[in-house]
């Protein structure tokens, strides 16, 4: 097996278990909230806690990795740490205890994605970068974190307790840390694309904001992280409390999100390599409106609802493009992990922290429909902003350059 392929799968599965642990609290929340008497506002704050520290750790962890070039060591330490934090979540017995453990987990998990994506970016050929980074970020995280997690964790919680579910969730990360030690190499930094020119080699990270794609990706990441976190946090409650599905039905419907994202982790980035980043981001972000729209207004069978949600969750396939591929093709190679940490960090702070906290507050005062309206609005905003992206896909740039060279 080629090293490039092995790297993608080791890091992709590792990130899958990152999301298995991150999403565990959402899928177990109906059990936790009943046991610890949480309000909707407290549910939103629990979802926000991890996003806040994830964002800060993602930026500073990525910047530290760029400065020291010790990406592998940082990755191994972070994976071991988040696994231990899952065990701590299992012993929490109050809102404050669980809130604190989720803050710690965010610190541990934050550096993993920017460091992993920088490793993949360095090892990927130009024509495969979007595909490789999409598979690394979305396939494992959604197959394990969104598809398998609700089925496994809800079943464990029903058979035992939610505490035991957290204990079990922490084990796979320790195994993946061993795989990283064995199979991942420290990369040799090289230019990623036409933007990686020697003239920019000495620029400060603040200079990144002069690139239009960087600040557009930051704002779109805020919108799409909010879109995703609102779905994770409030769909389980809406399914059970408003649509009156059983916990088992809820877990199956939530697992559809993982199946969709795993499937479209190949489709969306692959299409972007051929059709262009901008076109694909616009189209699939708009499709993201289908998820809240179907849950709010579709009255057919649960099977038909699952099909609509499967289609709508394809918008998750744009996340690695916004948070990885487009910034990495815009910024010089030596700043890739820092750039990705900036985009992911801002998305997590404002989208992952602010949106669920605000949604929980409005749900307590109005209804559980409000978070889903917010989710739809986020998808529309992201699609509108994508209209202004500067195309970075190497294949599209080559096609544009060919007529000029022929003249």
Residue spans for each PLM region:
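Juxtamembrane intracellular "pre-TM" segments in multi-pass secondary transporters
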Residues: 1, 187-218
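Extracytoplasmic gate region of multi-pass secondary transporters
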Residues: 25-26, 213-262, 324
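Helix-breaking motifs and short loop linkers at transmembrane-helix boundaries and internal kinks
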Residues: 37, 69, 91-97, 244, ...
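Conserved MFS/SLC helix-loop-helix module at the cytosolic interface between two early adjacent transmembrane helices
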Residues: 56-93, 272-278
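Cytoplasmic helix-loop-helix junction between adjacent transmembrane helices
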Residues: 101-141
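Helix-loop-helix hairpin linking two adjacent transmembrane segments in secondary transporters
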Residues: 136, 140-182
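C-terminal membrane-cytosol helix-exit motif in multi-pass small-molecule transporters
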Residues: 171-193, 385-390
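C-terminal transmembrane helical hairpin of 12-TM major facilitator-type secondary transporters
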Residues: 278-323
